[in-house]
Regions:
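Active-site-adjacent structural elements in enzyme catalytic cores
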Residues: 1-179
């Protein structure tokens, strides 16, 4: 569970689990997976962040935003976008995912739990168990949570002086960022 919806989550370095996330969602390697980070210091370890980008991140986090940034060398090649070398990153605002991140001690790789052919994410653990009975190693049941995906903002154009691009409007109010 996160502040936007339930998510499929795995260890960043577990290739088998990453492949399973992609298989369940039926997405290829051009679909951005997201690193869930505990705070902005973790974001800076996995992405190249300039001062202007950092100011936007600081305004928006924690919250229901996913930011596309240039990946650092810490990001395994198989989880960054193949042609753009970028990664989605977010700092969620939900106590359960924060506890999981604290217990794990490093970011987790995630994708919104939207099943193929659907537009809305699953937001109930019992329904997740019913829909994916043999696909998941476990489910953290935190009750029903939000079912609005994050607002996705591509910050990579800022490196060349261009404006950020809003790729998806979702749970995060991007207007408060001055965009």
């Amino acid at each position: 569970p996160t502040d936007s919806s339930y998510a499929l989550v795995c260890h960043l370095d577990d290739k088998t689990a990453v492949d399973r996330l992609r298989r369940i969602r039926q997405v290829d390697d051009r679909h951005h997976l997201t690193l869930l980070c505990a705070d902005l210091s973790e974001v800076a370890n996995y992405a190249k962040v300039d001062n202007q980008q950092y100011r936007l991140l600081k305004l928006a986090t924690p919250g229901a935003f996913t930011f596309i940034l240039d990946a650092s060398k810490e990001v395994p090649r198989r989880v960054s976008h193949p042609s753009r070398k970028s990664i989605g990153l977010r700092v969620p605002d939900h106590p359960v995912i924060h506890a999981l991140l604290a217990a794990h001690g490093e970011p987790l790789l995630a994708t919104t739990l939207i099943l193929p052919g659907e537009t809305d994410p699953l937001n109930d653990a019992a329904e997740i168990r019913e829909q994916l009975p043999n696909d998941l190693a476990g489910i953290i049941d935190a009750g029903a949570c939000a079912s609005t995906p994050t607002t996705v903002i591509d910050l990579t154009p800022m490196r060349t002086g261009e404006a950020p691009e809003i790729l998806r409007e979702g749970g995060g109010d991007w207007t408060r960022l001055g965009l």
